[in-house]
Amino acid sequence: MNTISPVVIEPRHGGEHHSVNVKYGIIIFAISVIHILFFLLVKFIEINRWKSNGRFNKSLWKLNNTPTWMLITLWILIIFFIGGANITEFSEEYITIAKRYGRIAYCLLPLNIYLILRPTNCVYLKPGYYLENLSLHKWLSRLISICTLIHAIGYFYKWNKEGKILIKSFRFLNFLGIVVFVMFAVLIIVSIRILRRKYYSLFYIIHNITAWSMVVLIIFHARPGVTIFGIICLILMCYQLLYLRFYKSYPVNNLKIVDIPMSTLQIIKIPKPSNFPTWLPGSHVRLNYTTSNIKSWINSSHPFTIANIPEDGVNYLSLVIKKPGNFIIDQYLTYLLTGPYISIDYPFYNSANLINIICGGSGISFGLPILNHYKSLNSNIPIKLIWCVRNRNDCFIMNQLDMTNVEVFITSAGDSSSDEQSPSSSSYQPVPLFVVDDEQDESHAKVEQTQGEEEVDGLLNQDENGIPLQSMKKESFPKKEEGEDEEKSSKDVFKYGRPKFDEVFAIDDPTLNPNYNDSWVIACGPDQLIEDAKYWSQEKGYRFFSEKYEM
């Protein structure tokens, strides 16, 4: 009698191998939670200690600002070892590795979304200083893309080897994964720096569609399921997109635009919402279109630093912005405003004993409120602010903001060589200030025309003919008295060339012996300006802080 051997039917996903990778996803998520809690705790301790003893703690600050390359290297090592754990024969278990990297990619999403959360006016928690997290978010996104790519390559190889690549690709649940993979491939291309900067709106749309698609579609695509991680991601994304937009935003209208034709800058005055909280100097807000405007959903909100301080007692927020920009403000539209968002750790304002600030172009909106804050306190702390512009017409903003004691450099080679071209020059024509609003009491200024010089990166890379600066007050634009030497007046207002840090930031009081642990250099502007200021601050032993608005 023939005995029929029982046929063992292997489960579709490989029996125990079907769920073998679940624990590795949980491990990645657990490490992500540890990462979040660790830096939350470090930031909280740093702020509290700094506040309580009035001393900047270098060790805690370094720990809180661990270099991105170091964190990403650590994550690469973690992913590499977890991705290859218990794999003995790559040629036989490559599909297990492919599955594992797909799960790793998805389980990293909660951390990556957390890094871009923007709670407003949150002084004790790491997300309150969300700008500190953006670099890590970018690189972690790239790491997730690589894990996704490994997952896709593994499966395409397997299906091609079996001769079923088309059949398997168009099975519904598999097809969902392919859709996400294609989106990631496109996102990687438009994320290339030159393309991202040129087509930022396109990049932003693809970025958001890819993010939402991955979170939602992979919930159905992944087997075993990743529902719990998907729910966490959706909660975080809904907070960012919906809660901040509908419950923590302020509708603003009747904006006032102060401008002159030849300037590269303009001032936007936004009526301060009645319940808008007090903000720290250097804080910024974000503007977006209202929810009824399609642009609100497909374009990013835009950050602008508040150039005035609460102590000014005015009922509006002043923004200094560069024109033309990707976000053109129309005074007749209503916008949604969120914020304020903090930039510098708030104990800085109670502990610094010497501050040197250098700003380029619209970066004046970051340095100026810090200067004016200390002036409002009648503080004896030595503080200097240097403002560098290429276009002399940009100085019209001095009639709109309190820029007393701001020292100004005109770095344009054209202006420098013409020294100069004074108001008495035959090429000089007065350019009246115009205000796009109904107010009649705005100041008027006469400023000189240039040949359309634009502010560019490398603002300070001009000839090193730096001239020691002198203070520049709002009164530096006086109405000319009859018989006044106009050429001399013009030269007194501006200095030309590149500022020499050793000269402009020289300590005026020879008896002053500053505590370098709480002495600061602050820079805001183009990359080259920031790099120069950082190098000088390190040479002198100062603490350094910089502000960039680019992604």
Swiss-Prot record:
MF GO annotations: ferric-chelate reductase activity
Transmembrane segments: 25-45, 67-87, 100-117, 138-155, 172-192, 199-221, 225-247
Membrane topology qualifier: Multi-pass membrane protein
Source organism per UniProt: Candida tropicalis (strain ATCC MYA-3404 / T1)
Gene3D superfamilies found in the cross-reference section: Nucleotide-binding domain of ferredoxin-NADP reductase (FNR) module (3.40.50.80)
Primary localization: membrane
Function recorded in the entry: Probable cell surface metalloreductase. May be involved in iron or copper homeostasis.
Compartment list: Membrane
Biased composition (Basic and acidic residues): 472-492
Broad EC category: oxidoreductase
GO BP annotations listed: reductive iron assimilation
Chain intervals for the UniProt region annotation (Disordered): 440-492
One GO CC annotation: plasma membrane
Domain FAD-binding FR-type: 247-369
Protein name (database record): Probable metalloreductase AIM14
InterPro entries: FAD-bd_8, Fe3_Rdtase_TM_dom, Fe_red_NAD-bd_6, FNR_nucleotide-bd, RBOH/FRE
Keywords: Electron transport, FAD, Flavoprotein, Ion transport, Membrane, NADP, Oxidoreductase, Transmembrane, Transmembrane helix, Transport
UniProt cross-references to Pfam families, sorted A to Z: FAD_binding_8, Ferric_reduct, NAD_binding_6
Positions of the Ferric oxidoreductase domain: 102-217
Homology family: Belongs to the ferric reductase (FRE) family. AIM14 subfamily.
EC identifiers of the protein: 1.16.1.-
